[in-house]
């Protein structure tokens, strides 16, 4: 059973590791920059990052390895690929190497790194041989809710999108949502600004949207139809 850790506790853990990263690369909190998850995993945590085809249907995005083990992936043509992984390996599906997958790739690396952070800090509570992350956040591959996966997702989000960095990006982008209402439309300049924020931070639209909702910058779900869209295209 994974140790109970609140969102606030996970945020505090992330903050300490971000401080290590900033100190290592000479970054100041007064002029914050997003962490590069590959550099973070390698330089701060001492992890070995590999990119390999993990499955034929994309349901496995990444693996976290705590002890020597073998893994068999079945490719689209039916070929079976057997790999031997070592402790402190994190393996990302090579399909995420594409530029269009930057946000998903970065979050997956941060997610797998988060598993190692938790295993390092709480060795009696974490550290299964192989941990797989599926498409559905906060759930195991078999669809059952997983407390450990929620913690890894939350810690990953705190590493990539700490509050101080998001606030700096909000100021940089001149984002203004007085009522917390966002239209997912090019007619809303805030939507474009948030997309630019996501690109600078290196996360997906979904990730930055959820983070802004958690910070209560956005209230509720984005509305798909902007009033100007109705004027332009009709109801």
For each predicted feature, which ranges?
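Active-site hotspot residues in diverse enzymes, especially metal/ion-binding acidic/histidine motifs
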Residues: 1-235
């Amino acid at each position: 059973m994974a140790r109970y850790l609140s969102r606030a506790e996970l945020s505090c853990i992330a903050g300490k590791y971000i401080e290590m990263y900033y100190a290592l690369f000479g970054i100041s909190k007064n002029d914050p920059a997003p962490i590069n998850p590959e550099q973070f995993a390698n330089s701060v945590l001492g992890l070995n990052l590999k990119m390999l085809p993990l499955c034929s249907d994309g349901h496995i995005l990444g693996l976290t390895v705590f002890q020597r083990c073998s893994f068999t992936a079945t490719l689209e043509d039916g070929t079976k690929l057997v790999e031997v992984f070592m402790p402190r390996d994190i393996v990302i599906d090579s399909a995420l190497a594409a530029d269009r997958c930057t946000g998903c790739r970065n979050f997956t690396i941060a997610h797998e790194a988060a598993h190692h952070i938790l295993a390092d800090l709480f060795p009696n509570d974490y550290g299964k041989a192989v941990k797989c992350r599926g498409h559905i956040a906060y759930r195991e591959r078999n669809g059952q809710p997983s407390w450990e996966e929620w913690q890894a997702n939350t810690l990953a989000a705190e590493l990539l999108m700490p509050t101080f960095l998001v606030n700096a990006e909000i100021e940089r982008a001149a984002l203004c949502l007085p009522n917390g209402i966002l239209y997912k439309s090019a007619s809303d300049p805030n939507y474009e600004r948030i997309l630019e924020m996501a690109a600078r931070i290196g996360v997906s639209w979904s990730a930055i949207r959820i983070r802004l909702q958690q910070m209560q910058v956005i209230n509720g779900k984005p509305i798909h139809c902007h009033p100007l869209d109705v004027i332009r295209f009709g109801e």
